[in-house]
């Protein structure tokens, strides 16, 4: 879970990119798995979420945010939890 000291301050400009995301207004269940979801159902949901991310104008900002604060759940910037974890283990904090 992100620690408060890792999160950006209350400056609205820092979060402005979220207003331009294609996911804005989309049900969060597309990006965050329900309890017990596995296998094919999870793979299909993640694939749909990543398809939206690929054409999103703020994918780089979203991905950078998720890596910088260690978002533990969901699809962020076209990356799943396990993909982000792998990048972080390799020492990559930001990737566009």
UniProtKB/Swiss-Prot annotation:
Record-annotated 4Fe-4S Wbl-type domain positions: 22-86
What InterPro entries is this protein classified in?
4FE4S_WBL, Whib
Which superkingdom is the protein from? Bacteria
Cofactors named for this entry: [4Fe-4S] cluster
Sorted keywords for this record are: 4Fe-4S, Cytoplasm, Disulfide bond, DNA-binding, Iron, Iron-sulfur, Metal-binding, Transcription, Transcription regulation
**Molecular-function annotations in GO:** 4 iron, 4 sulfur cluster binding; dinitrosyl-iron complex binding; DNA binding; metal ion binding; protein-disulfide reductase [NAD(P)H] activity
Gene Ontology cellular component terms for the protein in this record? cytoplasm
The consequence of inactivating this gene is: Not essential.
What the protein does comes down to: A redox-sensitive transcriptional regulator. Maintains intracellular redox homeostasis by regulating catabolic metabolism and polyketide biosynthesis. Regulates expression of the redox buffer ergothioneine (ERG). In concert with myothiol (MSH), another redox buffer, responds to low pH leading to acid resistance. The apo- but not holo-form probably binds DNA.
The family assignment reads: Belongs to the WhiB family.
Put simply, this protein is called Redox-responsive transcriptional regulator WhiB3
Native organism taxonomy: Bacteria, Bacillati, Actinomycetota, Actinomycetes, Mycobacteriales
Which gene is the coding source of this polypeptide chain?
whiB3
